[in-house]
Design a protein with these regions (language model features):
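Interdomain/boundary linker segments immediately adjacent to catalytic/signaling cores
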Residues: 1-62, 77
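Catalytic centers of nucleases
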Residues: 44-136, 140-146
Length: 147
């Protein structure tokens, strides 16, 4: 299996962020300690790390039968056209194709477990639902218990 296509993956992996993580609790504890890289700020970096995690999770979990994962910015034009996704790459974090050829969009949200995800506004879910209308499945991957 090839590595992450995420544009920040190489540097985050090189910094050994994912080393010595045995389960999701270890991952959440480590990410919450704050890891700032490339002057993006701690909150942006948390999101970057969670997006890389989600890409790997989708690729390796047999339940989803994923053929390929395309993070935002790496979705081939023919797939964006088929799903009618905007070319500004807004509203979704990526697309994954199943071994059956189904195209699914995904959105990654790293939040505290008790933080309510919002429907509208900045970082709301409404734009994800709106831009993903043509996807077979809209997949939300979140760390919050309050969706």
């Amino acid at each position: 299996m090839q590595g992450s296509k995420n544009k920040y993956a190489y540097e985050i992996i090189k910094a050994k962020f994912f080393d010595n993580i045995k389960n999701i609790d270890d991952f959440i504890k480590k990410i919450n300690k704050g890891f700032n890289f490339n002057n993006r700020g701690i909150e942006k970096t948390k999101g970057d790390i969670f997006e890389i995690f989600c890409e790997a999770y989708l690729k390796t979990n047999p339940e989803y039968q994923v053929k390929e994962v395309y993070p935002q910015g790496y979705v081939p034009i023919y797939i964006r056209n088929k799903l009618k996704l905007n070319f500004q790459d807004k509203g979704y974090d990526g697309v994954y194709e199943t071994i059956n050829g189904e195209l699914n969009t995904y959105q990654s949200k790293f939040r505290s477990k008790d933080e309510q995800l919002t429907w509208q506004g900045k970082n709301g879910l409404s734009s994800f639902i709106g831009v993903s209308e043509k996807a077979h499945i809209r997949h939300l991957l979140a760390t919050s218990n309050k969706v």
